[in-house]
Amino acid sequence: MALRPNDVTLRLTPPLAAAARRNRRAAAGGVRVYAVASGAVSTKVENKKPFAPPREVHVQVTHSMPPQKIEIFKSLDDWARDNILSHLKPVEKCWQPQDFLPDPASDGFHDEVKELRERAKEIPDDYFVCLVGDMITEEALPTYQTMLNTLDGVRDETGASPTAWAVWTRAWTAEENRHGDLLNKYLYLTGRVDMRQIEKTIQYLIGSGMDPRTENNPYLGFIYTSFQERATFISHGNTARHAKDFGDLKLAQICGIIASDEKRHETAYTKIVEKLFEIDPDGTVLAFADMMKKKISMPAHLMFDGEDDKLFEHFSMVAQRLGVYTAKDYADILEFLVSRWKISDLTGLSSEGNKAQDYLCTLAARIRRLDERAQSRAKKAGTLPFSWVYGREVQL
């Protein structure tokens, strides 16, 4: 659930008044899409599709990786088979959602559901907003598999390709699919959330896609996934700790087991980028700096529930306040990756590579300073109704 650093600094004003929100929603029939080229002046593009949410989409740069570099990834297929597929688990050894949920075939099913619902009554709405947001993010998995299959040199060319890259993408997707299934079923059983509004949000999100700005470029794509897997590991880990604090040990176990998967996937993606630094340090450090200058966005940044066209922003504000995922986490992830990939130790770089190295090694500290300054100036945000919790007001 990756917030961008400026998301936090720009979200600290109180939310719009209810009347203003209603007016905005009423005017949302003609959807506005903002196309922004890197370093260019914003250009407003009118999108007349009434079923799509208002959203910001950048000018789509495609196939930015030089064709000769595709050969790097083809040559790494055997390496990926030996070093990346080992981070997958055989299906028979994987946990399944049913392992953590009441058994509908059991005579004690109704009692187990009743106990689950009793525990859920002790959990506040703002936590459920974060948990729902995490679940919706996981449920947009078709988009993420699609994104991986846009990457030149590693995509699944047939839908059943035997290359190590294609095997990884399909098996990673299959493992991730359990996360949304488990959280979805748990939330349904609690009775605390409006499942129809949540299901609408999922449909809107998958229909909207995502805008990671990875340009069909596996250098950019694997840097993005390295960052995102660590972000989801942190987010699910924090929801697990909160659930434990609320006394729901089963929910803590659910969030914790998902976090452990994300950690394993993070290890695989960061290992891919580590290999790229070994083979092509200059090209990889330039790609890393490029992604950080664009700012890493959460995969679900285009979420919409049919009512709130700033839903992702408001959800992120709640997550920031509760400490589920924060600007500090964003800076910590960056710092972790800079250390993991030994950016400060790179030598023999071009002049542009040296500039990228300096930028990356100082960026985390800059982000922290900006966040501290913003927090010191921030006014207390108000409350906002979330459709996911039946329109109840939640503190931003």
Swiss-Prot record:
Binding, Fe cation 1: 138, 176, 179, 262
Cofactor binding comment, as recorded: Binds 2 Fe(2+) ions per subunit.
According to its UniProt record, where is this protein located?
A: Plastid, Chloroplast
Q: What are the binding positions for Fe cation 2 in this chain?
A: 176, 229, 262, 265
Might you give the EC number(s) for this enzyme?
1.14.19.2
Q: List the disulfide bonds.
A: none
Q: Which domain of life is it from?
A: Eukaryota
Null allele phenotype: Increased level of stearate (18:0) and reduced level of oleic acid (18:1) in leaves. Spontaneous lesion formation in leaf blades, retarded growth, slight increase in endogenous free salicylic acid (SA) levels and SA/benzothiadiazole (BTH)-specific inducible genes. Enhanced resistance to the blast fungus Magnaporthe grisea and leaf-blight bacteria Xanthomonas oryzae pv. oryzae.
Q: Which cofactor does it need?
A: Fe(2+)
The transit peptide of this chain lies at 1-32
Report the Gene3D superfamilies cross-referenced here: Ribonucleotide Reductase, subunit A (1.10.620.20)
Which pathway is this protein engaged in? Lipid metabolism; fatty acid metabolism
Record InterPro entries: Fatty_acid_desaturase-2 (IPR005067), Ferritin-like_SF (IPR009078), RNR-like (IPR012348)
Q: Which family does it belong to?
A: Belongs to the fatty acid desaturase type 2 family.
Assembly description:
Homodimer.
Protein name listed in UniProt: Stearoyl-[acyl-carrier-protein] 9-desaturase 2, chloroplastic
**Recorded name of the encoding gene:** SSI2
